[in-house]
Amino acid sequence: MSSIILEAREIRYRYPRGMEAICGISFHIRKKEKIALVGPNGAGKSTLLAMFNGMIRPDSGVLLFDNQPVQYDSASLRMLRKSVGFVLQNPDRQIIAPTVYQDVAFGPTNLGYPEHEVKRVVTQALRHVGLEGFEHRPPHQLSGGEKKRVAIAGVLAMDPDVLVLDEPTSGLDPSGSEDIMELLDELNHEGKTIIISTHNVELAYPWVDRAILMLEGKILEEGIPEKAFGNPEYVRRAHLSLPTLLELHIELQKRGFHLQGKKPHTVLDMMQTIETLFEKTYSSASPGAITMYNVDRHSPESFSSWHAGHSGVSIGAMGTRAKQRAENEHIHLDFTYGVIDKCILRALLGENSLIMTTDTMVDRVFQRVNAYVNESGIPITVNMMEGGSP
């Protein structure tokens, strides 16, 4: 198991002349985890997040970062906030400079980075969030999703170990929400611990490693999503709704269907459950194959050559740069979120598909497909497109 990076021990906090917002809670977060604090408005999620980088100090109890109690002197908070980056719910409250470049440069400049290093980290951060070429744009001309990306870039420029986001998809349409969640997935795969707050169970359920269900400053339940959301009474008390897949699973059980295996975490899991239930097997003589097009290694010409001989193939893109390449090359995308599972579902129908991805996400594709193959016993081949640079 990976080591603990954040830990709370019996922490409490009461706002001046207000009710107790955090009521003696304890928990831990491990390095490289994806965590969601889930609950209704007023549950204490935002207050707890603000404690993680020292914006709010507990009245009692201990908060630890990397196994050391958080100290609240200026020098200690400065180091903590470099390691634990915070993205506010409303990016307009976080973006303060007249241009995108100046805003992203604000943090590293204040940390004393030399000018050439500031330029390097800002360029890298903007590339990471898909905003290359936006350096001189005024923030007020950006869309809500673009502003959110600027705020994330400003935090990434300081290279934190932990990224904390308060309601990261607030105010975004479904497509924008999917893009932000996939960006966070990409950052997590690169080694960052990601902590979000949300009241959207459909967003949290398939995404998190663990969820912490909160109500009135207390923890109702925590654990893997199937456990955290698996008690309908707790979910009801938190004024939330069950994730659709879990609700369907529960309703099937109530009707006398004997469901085998784990509770469904994704649509792919649900399909496996249903097919096992009805003893359905795929009629295809063999599953389809998945090809990977690494935009960091393959040229647009490589794709054109490949696609000329593979018309009708479903195409998905995962990762900011992959989606940018698709847009620049006018490549129609069938999938932009949950891409790996959707390509596996296509393969089970005997159909081939292509995943556009980046260096950092290639391993994740292999890991997810191999995990499914090992669990199901169905052989699905994953190939790299030929002609890429080493």
Model-derived features with residue positions:
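Conserved ABC ATPase "signature" C-loop
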Residues: 216-217
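ABC ATPase nucleotide-binding domains
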Residues: 235-325, 338, 356, 364-368, ...
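Conserved ABC ATPase "signature" region
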Residues: 116-134
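ABC ATPase NBD Q-loop/coupling interface
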Residues: 62-79
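Conserved ABC ATPase signature
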Residues: 138-142, 146
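A short, flexible loop at the N-terminus of ABC-type nucleotide-binding domains that lies
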Residues: 1-8, 12-24, 31, 36, ...
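Helix-to-loop junction immediately C-terminal to a conserved catalytic motif
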Residues: 53
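ABC ATPase C-loop
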Residues: 155-156
